[in-house]
Curated annotation (Swiss-Prot):
Originating gene: Nwd2
Protein name: NACHT and WD repeat domain-containing protein 2
Residue ranges of every copy of the NACHT domain listed in the record: 410-737
A Pfam cross-reference name: AAA_16
Polar residues bias locations: 1703-1715
Organism, scientific name: Mus musculus (Mouse)
Ranges of the WD repeats in the UniProt entry: 963-1004, 1007-1046, 1140-1179, 1229-1271, 1272-1311, 1314-1353, 1355-1394, 1396-1434, 1476-1516, 1522-1561, 1614-1653
SMART domains assigned to the protein according to its UniProt record, in alphabetical order: WD40
Region (Disordered) residue spans: 1702-1721
LRR repeat residue intervals: 386-410, 677-698, 724-747, 883-906, 925-953
Length: 1742
């Protein structure tokens, strides 16, 4: 629980004592189940199976799942019900084995359940007496004699009971009923089934009758005691009630419940056949009566025994009396009514008992060290319980542990082969060490014993975590204050040595490390450099290892030289093994006969390992004296014996169930709990098919618990329990068992994948919440139906089974179990899901579930960070990335690293921090959408601020790979279809394949010392072709890096011999190469690696290009000639010549879609040829560029072939191939030259590099705007290479460093609009979602609230100073420093009219949008009509900080010492308040909900409430002395009750204006701005970080929302730019922040006290951006300009309208209602329409 839930409740003394015992290693003081809160709630159901079937089925279907959910959510524990009768066949109810198992499990539940443990369901049926499974020989013979005496036939007993001399003493046992076929009451053949059952029914009834009569006779004769007779005369239910309730304390009985159902006058209905299952009957039809003897026993149990218990304790007992239907008896309807009531009462009782008895245990949740210690302690107790050998080794270890007076001490080493008992020996030592030391050093001593079974927990695999956990345990035990544990491994080792020296005579120390070979190689742990060879006097270290693993024993011998410090565990001799076996058998009252002993001795002569002895014991304990035993009865190796054990289990429980159960336990990362095993097997259709072989399945489809119990019993001691984080897991006791289970059950890949999928689905919660999983029954059940008379019924059955789906009752799997929805930080972590899900998803190939179920799941991220597992988060993301190669994961990991410190300190801020960083890039990284939506859904639980639009500049650095000391050594770079793999060629002849992310060299080829001229990959990346200075082409198999062939390129016979390969290219199946100054092109077959023929051209070849289909080759030559050849035949088709034939063909481009060829010559001229008729190409376009003095650097055809990018030294041109004209042209700045340019994959961006510039530039192709300029820290970029597979770019710098840039991320980074200047003011309309910003320039920018992009720019003549909007936002009035005012139509961008004449100090607009108030400092202020521009009145008084009252009657402002209310109709001062002499007004505000009350603060440090109506001070509040010295701002709540005052410090001052009390709330930093929400519930403020706070992230300030009701900060969000303006919207609590770079951030507040949780986040348009995949970049903004001509000129008291003004010219003295002229009526209409729209769209708001 976090952050301090556990701290709110002091731990009880028992817990503290348990904790102390665990930390000091006093294992005998720990309870058997170890987990402080109990391992689970386990409830045993005691009932007669016949009459409670419906109740138990209903409880299982509806009540148990709810109780399980309750326990998981509130206590982090499992709720398990043990009902062994459920799901098994009727003929097994009487089984002695089942009854024995029931009593054993009942005892377990009573001992180990953390809460309720026993529920009795008792009806009118007493139940059958039991058939004994085994009877001592003397007792059995006495019963036989008594039966003969009673004249009973005893042949049946003699036939069914067999004498067994292997029992001690000898006994008779009931033979197995193998001859009785398995059947079930639900079978589709009831009559046949009954016939099958009859013989056994009769036999069992007769056996019971004989036992009953004989035992009664013996009891009457005094030959048998009552306690003995009970075995034969009592029913199972009485035994269970007596055992559970008979001798218990009142405190214990609080955990038990009994439900008694009485049926009134049941005897009357005895003849109704269906009533036989509700009571005991005797006799045959028609003389059927209720069994009086059974009724007597029932009354004794129900009406005497239970009431006696109730009288002495608080046992809960509920009795209900049911009345039968007169005709039908105990009908279905009556039973259903009873069951409904029982279900409700059962649920309430269980909840009551759980809440009263189970403690919420958060210790292991918050304390990983405590959990680690408990895990090893529980393993230690388990292993010690299996220790059998009392050997000399134990005495040596005992002697070693005791303190010695002299001599130096070394660690002691125990070694031996597998299965020699090293772990059990060390566990026994660890268990006894505390007691030995305590006994030796006296009662006042307090020894410390630390035990670790290496490799069994996450913290005991690596040396670093092992040393850390041991050091932490030492520090706690020896009360050493360690400020922080070292990060470096050598420092950690030094700390470990120092802590060893803390031991003393009173506090000796023993450290036991089992299985050193299990340590990982990390930090060179296996070299044992960390192990101290010499120990302090009171320290003992005991180690164990295998002798031949990793050379550990050899290294130990180099470290510790004394032979006395080594104990070798060698196999025992045969005699000792026989002795041990004999003792083990006697403990369970068994032995072997002398004849059988021969075969035992024979087995022990082959193997005497302790584990073999134990496995042999498992086998021989089941031998019977009359059964034949031979050499094959016992295996002779451990391996074979384990296999034999598993096979015997398969016979008992079913092959599929055992193989899958053991398979799941083996493949689970940490093991499985018992309930998880049940759940997972229920989801496995192959297991359920086996279990439902002869029955029709029904809901819920589960594995009967009996099979799980048999499995556990059969593997007792081998499948052990281990406690991890409040959960008890089943794990293998040793690695040998695990290896054999793996070999037998986890070999087939298809099975493995299916099982991993089932486990992954389980931990994902795919089938939870009642979701039904399809189940198709296999043939055996249907085959059993073949003798049905009606064939159509069989078809119906088949159809039913094909369509059937069943609830498997899998539990929900949230990441955390929430105790209280209103306290989201109090929770139990679902550690099982945390540890298992990722493991199974990566092994079953469910990539989407891996991404969206874990990594992109906000709840997982938040929980992991909250519990301190930040580094594990990064490791898991890296694992998922390696598995899926999704670049979103890489970006998420770098994002998390950048906010590490912030979210570790304040995990609640995670959602806001992620949203700020992910929103700008989500259009380019679409898989992050899921995480953003998760943040929207779950983030507001922890942080109420939700960013709607983020303007954060995302930092990005490419992957870098140093290739050589200089770019001159790098010959070629090739990207591949794998985004992280590149091929590089160096001039020294080496070709390397690199993984750029890991900087790992994957493969390398050396080209035999020849210099590489170039290399190319075939389109399918099958072949790598390399050109060398030896004039050879080397063709390699790219996958295996092996040379396939080497082809020499030859020129013409008359050519000079010293020429090199000038160039080469690849087509689909061919390579084409040509030499310098050669007219021939050699064509090579790639598949066979030999030259086919040579193309002979007219002139020297300069470039070659092939068509996409690989049919034609185009050879460019000198004098601008191009010859076309057929690649298949070598035929020359034609030659074309450009008109500008002075130079040579430098580039050729083939446009397959348009059937065109483009020739670009050395001077940049370009010609386009139509190749539809390949034999006669036609010239269609010609561009003469010879006048330009700029050479062509590179050329590229866009992927869709719609544009050609031509990069020249001084310019970049984009040629539209549709119209063949230059679409865009970008010129380099003065003294700058382009080195290279390419198009992004989608063609939206141009990427270029400049000469001598260490940066990559990104331009938007449509606007020419520079989106980003990214610095390359490794030096000037000399080469750009674009990937044809991914939107990636490779750049090579002068220093020989290769960088890989992700263009998607860079495009997204630049997807933020900025005005370029600091935002000075933000204006929001009362309605609508548009934002207007002023930034000290001549523009007003109109922002789209939803997208955060600039929609329009309104240009003015001067710098814009003021801006106001009508309430709908349709009209905008602005003023600039050139004394002009403008009225704009915001939708069309039209400047409707312009007024000149006076510089405005403040603009106001009335609430009804009819009038504008233009306040001036130097001249008269004016009120004018917005629709016409006509003056209403002049205001002669200068006003500051003015407001218009809500009734639109007054404009209220202040002067130095007065508050004035001026009439909007006359301009005269109607009301005023004057301060006393020398006192000035500092600030004032209107109260929104009280429009006639004004609040102002004076220099006398008083806050005054002044009534405008009465012109009196209503209330005056005196502030503390010097309070206003640094007044920054103050806000008034809408109801006028609170005033919020900020003084530029770290305090928020909340003033209660009614009581005058001042409350100070500490803020997170120095407050810069504050704003009160419109409803007065929240205060939004921005504060700057304290200087002493050390955070690695670049946050400058924080945006914080405080809920005024409780003063709690409900949200905080870092701001990474300097804020310049803060605004809140009126309608919703939306926050808009303007920044110094001209960008804006938009946030909203979602407080959970809001009923609807502001669903607007998910539905808001800002979220539609990333739901709309097509929108990847910001749209172009519209630009609107001001009117040059002035429509109206203001003079001192008059207006002069221009002749062409849209406003009617009229005298100011005329009526205010002016009529517009006909000429300009349209403009007037537009203004009026804009004003009218408010009444159509919204309700009027005065």
């Amino acid at each position: 629980m976090w952050p301090a839930g556990a701290g709110t409740k002091l731990p009880c003394p028992r817990d503290s004592a348990l904790r102390r015992a665990a930390f000091s290693g006093n294992l005998t003081a720990l309870p058997s189940h170890l987990v402080p809160a109990g391992r689970s709630v386990r409830v045993f159901i005691s009932a007669n199976p016949e009459d409670t079937g419906a109740e138990r089925q209903a409880l299982r279907e509806t009540v148990y799942p709810k109780l399980r959910e309750f326990c998981r959510e509130n206590y982090g524990l499992e709720f398990q019900v043990i009902d062994l009768y459920w799901g098994i066949e009727e003929d097994e109810w009487d089984s002695p084995e089942l009854q024995k198992m029931r009593m054993k499990l009942l005892e377990e539940c009573l001992k180990t359940s953390a809460g309720p443990c026993f529920v009795g369901l008792l009806g009118e049926k007493y139940g059958n007496i039991r058939i004994p499974g085994e009877v001592e020989a003397s007792e059995f013979e006495m019963i036989l004699d008594a039966a003969v005496e009673a004249k009973l036939e005893t042949k049946l007993l003699e036939d069914w009971y067999c004498r067994d001399e292997n029992s001690v003493p000898a006994a008779y046992y009931l033979r197995p009923r193998l001859e009785v076929p398995r059947s079930n009451k639900n079978s589709t053949q009831p009559s046949a089934s009954s016939e099958q059952e009859r013989p056994w029914q009769e036999i069992s009834d007769e056996i019971k009758t004989i036992f009953k009569a004989a035992v009664k006779l013996l009891h009457e004769q005094g030959k048998m005691k009552q306690s003995q007779a009970k075995r034969y005369l009592f029913s199972a239910i009485e035994d269970e009630f007596d055992f559970a309730l008979g001798k218990q304390t009142p405190a214990f009985l609080k955990k038990c419940v009994c439900y008694i159902r009485k049926i009134a006058n049941i005897e009357r209905f005895v003849k109704i056949p269906e009533m036989g299952k509700y009571m005991d009957i005797t006799g045959t039809d028609p003389r059927i009566v209720r069994d009086p003897e059974a009724q007597e026993k029932l009354i004794k149990l129900r009406d005497e025994f239970i009431p006696t218990i109730v009288a002495s304790s608080n046992l809960r007992v509920y009795t209900s009396v049911t009345h039968c239907d007169m005709k039908l008896g105990y009908s279905q309807e009556i039973e259903n009514h009873y069951i409904e009531g029982l279900g409700k009462q059962f649920y309430e009782d269980m909840i009551d008992i759980i809440q009263a008895t189970v403690q919420q245990n958060f210790d292991t949740e918050t304390d990983t060290l405590y959990d680690e210690i408990l895990q090893h302690s529980s393993l230690c107790k388990t292993y010690a319980s299996f220790y059998e050998y009392k050997c000399e080794s134990l005495n040596i270890l005992h002697k070693y542990i005791l303190p010695s007076k002299t001599g130096h001490i070394n660690p002691l080493v125990v070694y031996g082969g597998p299965c020699t008992g090293k772990t059990l020996l060390l566990a026994e030592v660890a268990k006894k060490a505390y007691g030995w030391l305590h006994e030796d050093t006296g009662p006042d001593s307090d020894p410390v014993v630390i035990v670790r079974f290496l490799g069994t927990t996450d913290m005991s695999i690596d040396l670093r975590t092992l040393l850390l956990s041991v050091c932490e345990q030492l520090a706690v035990n020896y009360r050493c204050l360690v400020q922080s544990f070292p990060k470096k491994i050598h420092d950690l080792r030094d700390l470990f040595i120092n802590l060893l020296n803390e031991s003393s005579l009173q506090r000796p120390l023993v450290i036991i490390l089992d299985a050193l070979e299990q340590l990982s190689e990390a930090d060179e742990a296996r070299k044992l450099w960390w192990l101290p060879a010499h120990l302090p006097r009171f320290v003992r270290i005991i180690l164990s290892t295998l002798p031949n693993k990793h050379g550990i024993l050899q290294k130990l011998r180099c470290l510790i030289h004394e032979e006395d410090n080594y104990i070798e565990l060698i196999p025992r001799d045969r005699k000792m093994c026989s002795q041990v076996l004999k003792h083990q058998l006697l403990r369970v009252k068994r032995k072997v006969t002398s004849g059988q002993q021969i075969y035992v001795n024979n087995a022990f002569s082959k193997c005497t390992l302790p584990m073999f002895v134990n496995l042999t014991f498992r086998e021989v304990r089941h031998w019977r004296s009359h059964k034949d035993v031979d050499e094959s009865s016992l295996c002779v190796t451990v391996h074979e014996s384990i296999e034999q054990l598993f096979w015997s289990l398969e016979k008992k429980c079913g092959q599929k169930l055992v193989s899958r159960a053991l398979g799941y336990i083996t493949m689970a990362k940490m093991g499985l709990s018992e309930m998880e095993l049940e759940d997972v097997l229920a989801l496995d259709n192959s297991v359920m098919n086996e279990l439902n072989e002869n029955t029709r399945p029904s809901n819920p489809l589960r594995v009967p618990y009996l099979y799980i119990a048999r499995l556990k019993e059969g593997l007792n001691g081998y499948l052990i329990e281990r406690h991890v984080k409040n959960v008890t897991l089943l794990v293998w006791a040793n690695r040998h068992l695990q290896l054999i289970a793996q070999k037998l059950y986890l070999q087939e890949d298809s099975n493995l994948r299916e099982m991993h999928t089932i486990l992954a689905d389980y931990f994902l919660g795919v089938w939870s919440g009642g979701r039904r999983k399809a189940f198709c029954l296999e043939d055996p059940y249907l085959n059993g139906c073949l003798d049905l008379e009606n064939r159509s019924l069989l078809e119906e059955e088949k159809h039913f089974m094909e369509q059937a789906s069943f609830d498997r009752q899998a539990p929900d799997q949230p990441w955390v179990f929430q105790c209280n929805p209103l306290e989201p930080d109090i929770f139990f972590v679902n550690h099982r899901k945390m540890s298992e899900l990722l493991y199974h998803l990566t092994r079953c190939g469910k990539t989407d579930d891996l991404l969206y179920g874990i990594i992109m799941n906000f709840s997982w991220l938040y929980t992991m960070i909250k519990i301190g597992q930040f580094d594990k988060v990064l490791a898991d993301i890296e694992l998922a990335y390696n598995y899926s190669q999704e670049k979103e994961l890489k970006f998420l990991a770098s994002t998390l690293r950048s906010i590490r410190n912030k979210v570790i300190a304040f995990p609640g801020s995670l959602s806001a921090e992620l949203q700020q960083r992910l929103l700008p890039v989500v259009s380019s990284l679409p898989k992050l959408r899921h995480l953003l939506l998760e943040c929207d859904k779950d983030g507001p639980k922890y942080c109420s601020i939700v960013p709607l639009h983020s303007s954060m500049d995302v930092t990005y650095s490419p992957e870098r790979l140093p290739l050589a000391s200089s770019h001159l050594h790098v010959t070629e770079i090739l990207p591949t279809c794998n985004p992280s793999t590149v091929l590089t060629a160096l001039e020294n002849g080496s070709i390397s394949t690199w993984d750029v992310e890991t900087r790992q060299l994957l493969r390398q080829i050396t080209t035999a010392q020849s210099v590489i001229l170039g290399m190319k990959l075939s389109s399918d990346e099958k072949y790598l072709v390399v050109a060398t200075t030896n004039n050879t082409l080397l063709i390699y198999d790219n996958v295996n890096s092996c040379l396939l062939s080497e082809v020499e390129i030859k020129g013409t016979k008359h050519g000079s011999g010293s020429t090199y390969i000038n160039g080469f290219t690849l087509s689909v199946n061919h390579a084409l190469a040509w030499l310098e100054a050669s007219k021939d092109v050699t064509v090579i077959d790639l598949l066979y690696g030999w030259p086919l023929y040579q193309f002979h051209c007219w002139y020297e070849v300069t470039c070659v290009q092939c068509s996409l289909d690989g049919v034609y080759a185009f050879c460019g030559q000198y004098l601008n000639n191009t010859t076309i050849f057929h690649l298949g035949s070598g035929e020359k088709i034609c030659t074309v010549t450009s008109e500008f034939s002075g130079g040579f063909v430098k580039f050729l481009l083939i446009l397959d879609t348009a059937q065109e060829m483009v020739m670009v010559d050395s001077e940049g001229s370009l010609s386009v040829w139509n190749t539809e008729d390949i034999s006669n190409p036609q010239l269609t376009e010609d561009f003469d560029c010879r006048k330009e003095d700029s050479e062509v650097v590179s050329i590229e055809l866009s992927e869709d072939q719609s544009a050609i990018l031509i990069c020249k030294a001084l310019s970049i041109e984009l040629l539209d191939t549709g119209m063949w004209k230059v679409a865009e042209k970008f010129r380099a700045r003065h003294n700058e030259r382009f080195v290279s340019a390419v198009l992004s994959k989608n063609g939206d961006c141009i990427i270029a590099t400049m000469e001598n510039t260490p940066a990559v530039f990104f331009w938007r192709r449509d606007t020419g705007q520079c989106l980003a300029s990214l610095q390359e820290s490794s030096g000037t970029i000399v080469k750009l290479v674009k990937s044809s597979h991914h939107n990636m770019l490779l750049s090579l710098s002068t220093s020989g460093v290769l960088s890989i840039w992700d263009i998607d991320i860079i495009t997204a980074m630049s997807n933020i609009d900025k005005t370029g200047k600091p935002i000075q003011s933000l204006v929001l309309p009362a309605r609508g979602e548009i934002i207007y910003s002023l930034d000290g320039s001549d523009c007003v920018h109109k922002w789209n609230f939803s997208s955060g992009f600039i929609e329009a720019v309104f240009k003015h003549e001067g710098i814009v100073e003021h801006c106001v909007l009508t309430s709908t936002g349709d009209l905008m009035v602005t003023s600039d420093d050139k004394s002009s005012q403008y009225v704009w139509h915001t939708s069309s961008g039209e400047n409707l009219f312009r007024i000149n004449g006076q510089r405005i100090s403040q603009l106001l607009i009335t609430h009804n949008d009819q009038f504008v108030v233009s306040l001036c400092e130097e001249n008269a202020s004016r009120v004018w009509r917005l629709a016409t521009g006509h003056r209403v009145c002049n205001i002669l008084t200068t006003l500051q900080n003015a407001f218009i009252t809500s009734a639109n009657t007054f404009v209220v402002g202040m002067t130095k010492s007065k508050v004035l209310a001026v009439s909007l109709w006359t301009g005269s001062i109607t009301k005023k308040f004057c301060c006393e002499d020398g006192i000035t007004i500092v600030n004032f505000k209107l109260i929104p909900d009280c429009p006639d009350v004004i609040v102002f603060i004076t220099s006398a440090e008083t806050v005054n409430l002044w009534s405008l109506t009465d012109e009196v001070i209503c209330r005056r509040v005196q502030l503390p002395s010097n309070f206003l010295k640094n007044l920054e701002d103050f806000e008034i709540s809408p109801n006028g009750k609170l005033g919020i005052i900020s003084r530029g410090d770290e305090n928020i001052n909340v003033l209660d204006l009614h009581s005058g009390k001042l409350r100070v709330v500490h803020a997170s930093g120095v407050i810069w701005r504050q704003r009160l929400s419109r409803d007065g519930r929240y205060l939004v403020y921005i504060c700057f970080r304290n200087g002493e706070e050390e955070e690695e992230n670049d946050a400058i300030s924080s945006l914080i929302v405080m809920r005024l009701a409780d003063g709690k900060n409900i949200g905080a969000c870092s701001l990474y730019k300097t804020p310049t303006f803060l605004a809140l919207s009126q309608r919703h609590l939306n926050i808009i922040v303007g920044f110094d770079d001209g960008s804006i951030g938009i946030y909203t507040v979602v407080d959970r006290v809001d009923a609807a949780l502001k669903i607007k986040i998910a539905t808001s348009n800002s979220r539609q951006i990333f739901n709309n995949a097509t929108q990847t970049s910001r749209p172009k903004s519209n630009s609107y300009s001001f009117k040059v001509s002035v429509d109206c000129l203001w003079r001192e008291s008059t207006e002069v309208f221009a002749r062409d003004s849209p406003i009617t010219v009229s005298d100011s003295s005329e009526s205010n209602e002016a009529t517009p002229s006909k000429k300009h009526n349209s403009c007037y209409d537009r203004v009026c329409a804009a004003l009218e729209s408010r009444s159509h769209s919204y309700t009027p708001d005065n």
